[in-house]
Amino acid sequence: MRRAIRVMALSAIGLLLLPYLLTPLYRIGHPVSTLMIWRTLSGAPMSRQWIDFAALPPSLPRSVVASEDAKFCSHQGIDWDSLREVLDDAEDGEFKRGGSTITQQVAKNLFLWPGRSMVRKALEFPLAMWIDAVLSKQRILEIYLNIAEWGPGGQFGVEAGSRYAFGRSAASLTAREAALMAAILPNPVRRSARKPGPGVRRLAGTYMARARAAELRGCWSGNRSL
């Protein structure tokens, strides 16, 4: 009995440590998300074509950061200020989207499971800080752009999403199209860059303006110049 308990405990510890051991390996390569794996195993539609960060127009990562994580360049994986605002709103009975950084979403997508769970959040926080410490901001963003869900039919990554929405590679997106892609996050099933409604178009205009902010121009390196 004790041996079985010991084996179970060691197995649990091993599972908890596995993401921390795998993270340094993700400095290179084309990692996939747990949702992509699940859809493949279950036979659900899934398409993804990796695109390198350097091939993307600068407006795309800037628009996504403006949309999803305005403090991406300055935080260490967790945006504590935004998190406190979300908690304060929850105490007041207001449940708003927000609080999860791009780094947290990478942690969840690579190693954890979707849906709301206190257990998942407890695992996600230290993992996001570890990812931020081990990977560069550019690499974190590159992974996010290639594993986020970006279409209603199992399109994962901005390349598959761009080909679905506009019929061409993400490498050739205009600033307006890049902002539309950012505007459909985090719900590309209900929102559409292909046939954007008034709300999506309004958000895209906001993100286009935010993407020009000076602080987003020096956050990462290696992207082709404007």
Swiss-Prot record:
Which cellular compartments is it found in?
A: Cell inner membrane
One Gene Ontology term of the biological-process aspect is:
regulation of cell shape
Chief location bin: membrane
Cellular component aspect of the GO annotation: peptidoglycan-based cell wall; plasma membrane
- Catalytic activity of the protein: [GlcNAc-(1->4)-Mur2Ac(oyl-L-Ala-gamma-D-Glu-L-Lys-D-Ala-D-Ala)](n)-di-trans,octa-cis-undecaprenyl diphosphate + beta-D-GlcNAc-(1->4)-Mur2Ac(oyl-L-Ala-gamma-D-Glu-L-Lys-D-Ala-D-Ala)-di-trans,octa-cis-undecaprenyl diphosphate = [GlcNAc-(1->4)-Mur2Ac(oyl-L-Ala-gamma-D-Glu-L-Lys-D-Ala-D-Ala)](n+1)-di-trans,octa-cis-undecaprenyl diphosphate + di-trans,octa-cis-undecaprenyl diphosphate + H(+)
- The question of whether Membrane is a record keyword is answered with yes
Q: What is the lineage of its organism?
A: Bacteria, Pseudomonadati, Pseudomonadota, Alphaproteobacteria, Hyphomicrobiales
Q: Which InterPro entries match?
A: Glyco_trans_51 (IPR001264), Lysozyme-like_dom_sf (IPR023346), PBP_transglycosylase (IPR036950), Pep_trsgly (IPR011812)
NCBIfam families listed in its UniProt record: mono_pep_trsgly
Family matches, as Gene3D superfamilies: Biosynthetic peptidoglycan transglycosylase-like (1.10.3810.10)
The UniProt record lists the EC number as 2.4.99.28
Q: What name has this protein been given in UniProt?
A: Biosynthetic peptidoglycan transglycosylase
The record's family statement is:
Belongs to the glycosyltransferase 51 family.
Protein keywords:
Cell inner membrane, Cell membrane, Cell shape, Cell wall biogenesis/degradation, Glycosyltransferase, Membrane, Peptidoglycan synthesis, Transferase, Transmembrane, Transmembrane helix
GO molecular function annotations of the record:
pentosyltransferase activity; peptidoglycan glycosyltransferase activity
